[in-house]
């Protein structure tokens, strides 16, 4: 591995550095920290080629707005892209040519789901990246080449989006002066809100692990960034995204949405039911949800953070 080809310094990828930062910031899972650093590294390579056509969103972007003691790890790269699939392929080809090795590291593999949940113009890839961790730490059987796998998603957009440039100087996984193009806070929060409503537009119950992550991001953005948000902008962006997602699900899922035209009140009712479930997470009657919450704590969070999903309905009134 030629670390001189990377944006982040070689020291950032060393095991000793991960251990030091884990101890400093209270994280428990070194594998997730390593993956998050590779997320940021790969995004910079993509950004260098695609310029202002690419924007980081999702969990990775969220961490740039949160203080270190509220940040979590993220294992995926979710991006908005104003361009074509051919441009994506050419970008990935250039990265493979620049970083690719003989042991299959830094090569992209297209993923095509058998039963997609939406018809979004989404292009998903997986890539193996080098790892300094043991097989046990990566939860893998013996491998001749230590690696981890990144998930990279491009969501094609019909027009360019606004974005903010933020450095990684306050990110738990690395001290980086590089600028990352990320979704503006109001847009990001509105996008996060559309993950609520498991039977309408949100993350479905089949993905409870993803639901718990989204609840966390919404709670922490509300707790730490609410004074920086413009409620009118959040509402405008949310309603636009919600309708898009409604119409997408209506086509692909064949659910009860088929018999209803888009109406925000249906989503609100759905969200209220979902919030009630999380409010009762410690009742002892929902072992499945409680397990996913506990798993999220151990895999993604630092020891210092206080995260109790059942407090979400009581703490926030933004959905009322």
Q: Model-found features: residue ranges?
A:
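Structured mid-to-C-terminal alpha-helical surface segments
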Residues: 1-54, 66-72, 77, 81-320
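Glycine-rich beta-strand-to-loop/alpha-helix junction loops that act as flexible
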Residues: 56-61
